[in-house]
C-alpha cells in the first residue's frame, strides 16, 4: 500500500497510493463501503460520532490487515469536520475518495418537531457535506489533477426524490444533498472531481429498524448493493460521471 515516492537526500517519506474518508463509518453503509475501499487499496479514515462503535469497526478492519485510522467526530459540528480532514491529511497526505455518509432521521409531525431536532438533522445530513468539500478541496483537486478521477459520494435517500410525511426535515435535507451534488458537478467536474448522490429506499441497517415490522430486513436493499454501486463509480473512466443513483425495491408480487 505504501510507496517511497518523495526523496530528500537520504530521507524517504511514505506516501499512500490512494486514500479515502468515510463518514458514518462505524456501521451500515459507511462501514461496508469503507471495507471495500480498504480492500481495494485505499488508506481509509473512518469518521463517526460514537467512539465505542467506531473503535469496534476500526479493530475489525485492522484485524483483517487493512490500512485504516479512526477519527471520532460529530460531523454536525464545524470544528469536528475541520479536525477530521486535518487528521486525514496528516496521516495520508492525499484524498481520492470522500464518502459523506453520516446521517440521522427523526420522525415526527412538523407541529411537534423541536428546533433542536430540526438542527440536528440539518447540520448532520446537509451542512456537514459542504463543510467536508470545503476542507478537503485542496486534496481532492490534487487528486483530480493527477488522475481526473477524484470521487465524492454523498448519501442522500429516496426521501430526497419524494418528500415523506413525518420525515419532513429529513426529506428536506436529502433534497438538499441531491441539489448540492448537482451544483458540485457543475462547479468541480472540470477539475477531475466527480460527485454522485446515492438515493436508496430502505436499506437493511439499524437506521431502518423502525420499518422492519412491515418490511423485513431481507426484503430491503442490502448494504452490498450500495457497495457494488460505489465500486462501479470507482471503475468509470475520466470522461464519465454519474450525478445520482436511485435504488428502489421491486414491486411486491
Region locations from a protein language model:
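Substrate-binding pocket helix/loop in short-chain dehydrogenase/reductase
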Residues: 109-110, 114-122
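C-terminal helical subdomain
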Residues: 197-198, 205, 213-253
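Conserved glycine-rich cofactor-binding loop
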Residues: 26-27
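Conserved glycine-rich Rossmann-like NAD(P)H-binding loop of the short-chain dehydrogenase/reductase
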Residues: 40-56
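Active-site helix of classical SDR
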Residues: 133, 173
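The beta1-alpha1 cofactor-binding region of Rossmann-like NAD(H)/NADP(H)-dependent oxidoreductases
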Residues: 51-52, 72-83, 115
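Residue(s) in the substrate-gating loop at a strand-loop-helix junction
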Residues: 157
